[in-house]
Amino acid sequence: MRLTIAGDSHGKYMIAVLEGIPAGLKIDEEIIRRELFRRRNCYGRGKRMSMEEDAFEIVSGVWGGITTGAPVTILVPNKAGNPVKDVRSVPRPGHIDYAAFVKYKLPDLNVYVERSSARWTVALTAAGALLKSLLREFNIDVLGFVTRLGNVEAKNIPDNFEELRRKRDESAVFCPDPEATEGMISEIDRAKEEGNTLGGKVKVIARGVPAGIGSYSDLFKKLDSKIGSLFFAIPAVKGVVIGSEEMWYGFDYLDEFELEDGRIKRRTNNLGGIEGGITNGEDVWVNVFVKPIPTTGKPLNSVDLRTMEPAKTPYVRSDVTAVPPASVVCEAALAVVISDALLEHLGDGNIDDLKRRFGNENLPRWDDGFWKEYDR
């Protein structure tokens, strides 16, 4: 499977093209609408999100709601115009401005923002949401939520997956801990008043992923390699940890095996469901660190690249924090990565053929008497 994303932040459309989607898959457009709404409507968003409607259109690869096997193209119109009309020459610390100017040497810093703006993640969100229709056929579910925003960290996160989803959806910042949600909202209000911005942390879980997805032979097809590649492409993401961050002692960290009713289980899942680039049958889970947005309400010190004189950074329409919407985007990103690895594993064709291959697999299972039986 291949995902291509194009479009400028203030151009006519953001575009996602998915190649390699099997034929015969029924697409649930309501999932796409819901995920685009969640990305757009969360606490801490700026003025632009009130202008956008994100009314997507699927213009190829789907006929009568069913995929044809051809590339699937999703268009998301941009409604908001560019608020900056003049040439901008003062770079913002933490943004693409200066580094892109040094490399590409175009004099207007506005040019670089069109591609590096997080607006393109609306296309990633749409693509990931569409792929949830595929994952649902294999009983795989993906869920993302906020675990930290500024100095506030979630402490009471439900273990039950459906309760986790319900509490996440009840939160204005997509945090499943109600007490932490209140604190995060206060953090956002305080940062907005001070002209500051906030970073934080997001967790994404993929439940139901079978063992044996990914690769150990091809370094770039390792599932953790693919996760890192796509997640680090998301603006503001500065760190990705698969599984637990507490990895100091082997006795505490390594997931020991045990037998339960003749099946191999793990006592813990600190490794995040991946060993050596291949899924091991446990939930795949990822911690993502999101930096503060570089456009602050209070100006920062910079340099005017035209005059080479000290200058203050301009304010360009922006959010207070990217953390809540990043939880939606990262959820979509994990859906893309898991779908890609799953299709690579199962091959091409009609969705019913893929489901038969999936159901008939006996990996790994031995009949030499060493193991009685092992199921994914």
Swiss-Prot record:
The keyword Lyase applies. Signal peptide: none annotated. It is an enzyme of class 4 (lyase). Keywords: Amino-acid biosynthesis, Aromatic amino acid biosynthesis, FAD, Flavoprotein, FMN, Lyase, NADP. Its cofactor is FMNH2. GO terms for molecular function: chorismate synthase activity; FMN binding. NADP(+) binds at residues 39, 45. It holds the Pfam family Chorismate_synt. It catalyses: 5-O-(1-carboxyvinyl)-3-phosphoshikimate = chorismate + phosphate. Reduced FMN (FMNH(2)). FMN binds at residues 115-117, 276, 291-295, 317. Disulfide bonds: none annotated. Its EC number is 4.2.3.5. One of its GO terms (biological process) is aromatic amino acid family biosynthetic process. Pathway: Metabolic intermediate biosynthesis; chorismate biosynthesis; chorismate from D-erythrose 4-phosphate and phosphoenolpyruvate: step 7/7. One of its GO terms (cellular component) is cytosol. This reaction introduces a second double bond into the aromatic ring system. Homotetramer. Belongs to the chorismate synthase family. HAMAP family: Chorismate_synth. This is Chorismate synthase. It comes from Thermotoga sp. (strain RQ2). The gene is aroC.
